């Protein structure tokens, strides 16, 4: 009960103060409140303007980052392909020498092909080589069908052109000859 009585007294005191103020004091009090409200509004307005400027800067920075990402997205891919180009150039130079043999040229081409395929795999490109597998119309395109006794129907007999996927998505289907 003591707490309740003291709370009632506190509630009455502000009312008494407000009633006991002179008009001049009321005016001064209201002016002070107005000044504080105006200052608070000004501070909030400044915060809003800074936030808007920060958002504009963020938009510009993000737009520039996206532009750079588009420009240089293939940078590492191109650098990796240059390795393959260098290998081809060395192969051509070697093939032009008088002592070059067909065997050496073929070995060089096979090595270059391996480098090329490993470069593609680094970037998520996987070769589809479906020889002796069942024909899959989602990954393979039948060039022709040949009756072949002793082979399962709809199995791939020969790969005419390899297919490729990029990160699991088909880029080019494998062109195949299928057993009928």
UniProtKB/Swiss-Prot annotation:
Quaternary context: Homodimer.
Kindly state a single biological-process term from the GO annotations of this entry: protein folding
Molecular function GO terms recorded: adenyl-nucleotide exchange factor activity; protein homodimerization activity; protein-folding chaperone binding; unfolded protein binding
**InterPro entries xref list:** GrpE, GrpE_coiled_coil, GrpE_head
Q: Which NCBIfam families match?
A: PRK14150.1
The role this protein plays is: Participates actively in the response to hyperosmotic and heat shock by preventing the aggregation of stress-denatured proteins, in association with DnaK and GrpE. It is the nucleotide exchange factor for DnaK and may function as a thermosensor. Unfolded proteins bind initially to DnaJ; upon interaction with the DnaJ-bound protein, DnaK hydrolyzes its bound ATP, resulting in the formation of a stable complex. GrpE releases ADP from DnaK; ATP binding to DnaK triggers the release of the substrate protein, thus completing the reaction cycle.
Q: Where in the cell is it found?
A: Cytoplasm
Reading the lineage from the top rank, the first entry is Bacteria
- In Swiss-Prot or TrEMBL terms, this protein is called Protein GrpE
Q: Where is this region: Disordered?
A: 1-31
Q: Give the keywords, sorted.
A: Chaperone, Cytoplasm, Stress response
Recorded source organism is Ruthia magnifica subsp. Calyptogena magnifica
């Amino acid at each position: 009960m003591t707490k309740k009585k003291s709370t009632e007294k506190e509630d009455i005191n502000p009312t008494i103060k407000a009633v006991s103020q002179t008009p001049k004091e009321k005016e001064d009090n209201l002016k002070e409140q107005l000044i504080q409200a105006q200052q608070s509004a000004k501070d909030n307005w400044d915060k809003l303007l800074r936030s808007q400027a920060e958002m504009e800067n963020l938009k510009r920075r993000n737009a520039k980052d996206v532009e750079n990402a588009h420009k240089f997205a293939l940078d590492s891919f191109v650098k990796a392909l240059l390795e393959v180009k260098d290998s081809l150039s060395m192969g051509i130079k070697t093939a032009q020498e008088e002592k070059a043999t067909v065997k050496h040229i073929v070995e060089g081409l096979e090595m270059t092909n391996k480098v090329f395929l490993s470069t593609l795999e680094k970037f998520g490109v996987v070769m589809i080589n479906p020889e002796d597998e069942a024909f899959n119309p989602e990954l393979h395109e039948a060039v022709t069908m040949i009756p072949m006794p002793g082979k399962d129907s709809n199995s791939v007999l020969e790969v005419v052109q390899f297919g490729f996927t990029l990160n699991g998505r088909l880029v080019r289907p494998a062109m195949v000859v299928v057993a009928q």
